[in-house]
Amino acid sequence: MDISVFSIQKSRADSFENEIKEYIKMSAKFANISDKIIFNDKIAKAQSIGKDEALKAYDEAYEPNLKGFCVMLDERGSELNSSEFAKIFEQNMQLSFFIGGAYGLSKNLKDKAQKVISLSKMTMAHKIAKLVLFEQIFRGLCINANHPYHK
């Protein structure tokens, strides 16, 4: 199983990088997981202009990566418990998760996804959402493997 997590962020260095690497390492016995950070001059310029331009730049950056079962993270997406989230992994061998940039994700991009989910009704920093997503991916894989991590 291949799982890719795509995020738009300025740099790889953040306060949760070590924790994310640890979840990737722990998940390796279940799946090949990659953390794909996307940021370029076009995104930087578009974000400084405004929301519409930024969303268009995010679309252009993400669309070539729409492979396998695509899951978008959005505050208005469906909320799942950990067992429901784990079911996503049962029938899909290639999954791609997408975390929006400062302006979220466009309707156009969300419409191309097989699933749109929310991690919480609360608003949280993107780096926290990303850490929670990696933990839930590990938890979901453990649930499906009957691993004791999820009790």
From Swiss-Prot:
It holds the Pfam family SPOUT_MTase. Keywords: Cytoplasm, Methyltransferase, rRNA processing, S-adenosyl-L-methionine, Transferase. It is an enzyme of class 2 (transferase). This is Ribosomal RNA large subunit methyltransferase H. It catalyses: pseudouridine(1915) in 23S rRNA + S-adenosyl-L-methionine = N(3)-methylpseudouridine(1915) in 23S rRNA + S-adenosyl-L-homocysteine + H(+). The keyword Cytoplasm applies. Signal peptide: none annotated. It comes from Campylobacter curvus (strain 525.92). GO terms for molecular function: rRNA (pseudouridine-N3-)-methyltransferase activity. S-adenosyl-L-methionine binds at L73, G100, L119, S120, K121, M122, T123, M124. Specifically methylates the pseudouridine at position 1915 (m3Psi1915) in 23S rRNA. Homodimer. It is found in: Cytoplasm. Coiled coil: none annotated. Its EC number is 2.1.1.177. The lineage of its organism: Bacteria, Pseudomonadati, Campylobacterota, Epsilonproteobacteria, Campylobacterales. Belongs to the RNA methyltransferase RlmH family. GO terms for cellular component: cytoplasm. Its main location: cytoplasm. CDD domains: RlmH-like.
